[in-house]
Amino acid sequence: MGLLSAPPCTQRITWKGLLLTASLLNFWNPPTTAQVTIEAQPTKVSEGKDVLLLVHNLPQNLTGYIWYKGQIRDLYHYITSYVVDGQIIIYGPAYSGRETIYSNASLLIQNVTQEDAGSYTLHIIMGGDENRGVTGHFTFTLYLETPKPSISSSKLNPREAMEAVSLTCDPETPDASYLWWMNGQSLPMSHRLQLSETNRTLFLLGVTKYTAGPYECEIRNPVSASRSDPFTLNLLPKLPKPYITINNLKPRENKDVLNFTCEPKSENYTYIWWLNGQSLPVSPRVKRPIENRILILPSVTRNETGPYQCEIRDQYGGIRSYPVTLNVLYGPDLPRIYPSFTYYRSGEVLYLSCSADSNPPAQYSWTINGKFQLSGQKLFIPQITTKHSGLYACSVRNSATGKESSKSMTVKVSGKRIPVSLAIGI
């Protein structure tokens, strides 16, 4: 801390010396002459240590000086003062018993606490002129001794190369910085290793045996540094991505038998099947031989297209395959003819439309009285006559399923059309 003038020992006055203190307060004034400099020794202060507020550039012809806690000069913030004439020390309400004032105006604070951190004001009383005085301010920050950190992990047993993990350095410590070490070295540059904004959390993207650790974190501030114990991730063996093989991706409805197989084969895994994101329920229709690795559907309907997934699991977790969706071939169902009107008058428009559920879409054709008219879903006759009366049939065919179906209706066309004006008696 350097050489100090010995603290006066001739006389000490407690707060009861209020009259003398009041007389000192009369000399307070803004600085007019000397530049007072205050520095802390040591410059970085940790809790429980001592700090000396060392004063430089003291002006000449001094009467005394007063120390305040904070930047407000009043009796409440008054710590202690020194009167040169008589070497008298006076203690104020802010005195804690740990402050020592020296004849060179320096202030020693012992066993500093968090409450001691902050601003201090030194007011110097100059003799010869009661209206002259010099004021200096100083602020110091108190740093806590850093605690021994520990590392917490979002996953203790991540799956190799498959899972992201975040490591956090605990505890969160104010006014401190965080450093990370892997295998005793500072972190390498890698897109798989990313730090949070404060460096307190380390993100590992796809942990491998090369990035499993050991890791250490360090908490550091200007007065101390502490490093954690090594932390190593327990990597689980990588699960292979399963996939589904199937004997027929385009089965015919209620006709073809489907065999699903979950690959790869292993005695170390269990197998689970999923349909539409739900675990496949137990059903007499579904057979699962060979420890559930093979799924057999004796038949399939248009409502069972999927998606299907298989999952392989070990004692720690599982992974699913990409979804597989079937293209179930069906139909054509019984066609529908619209509109279903059967009575028309000569001169009216005949427009019929035919539709049937089918995959792939069916081929359509129209016949009248058994005679082919056209191919397509729609039949249009601009002006019908009585000659157009008869049996209209829509036939549908699906070449993929080999199925056919038809629907017929009878159309009757009466004589000459009656004008609307006559029909309503105009």
UniProtKB/Swiss-Prot annotation:
Signal sequence annotation: 1-34
Highest taxon of the lineage: Eukaryota
UniProtKB keywords: Disulfide bond, Glycoprotein, Immunoglobulin domain, Repeat, Secreted, Signal
Entry GO terms, CC: extracellular region
Residues bearing glycans: 61, 104, 111, 199, 268, 303
Subcellular location per the Swiss-Prot or TrEMBL entry: Secreted
InterPro entries linked to this entry: CEA_cell_adhesion, Ig-like_dom, Ig-like_dom_sf, Ig-like_fold, Ig_sub, Ig_sub2, Ig_V-set
Every Ig-like C2-type domain range: 147-234, 240-327, 335-410
Pfam family, one: Ig_2
Location of the Ig-like V-type domain: 35-144
Intrachain S-S bonds: 169-217, 262-310, 354-394
Family: Belongs to the immunoglobulin superfamily. CEA family.
Protein's name according to its UniProt entry: Pregnancy-specific beta-1-glycoprotein 8
Organism: Homo sapiens (Human)
Gene: PSG8
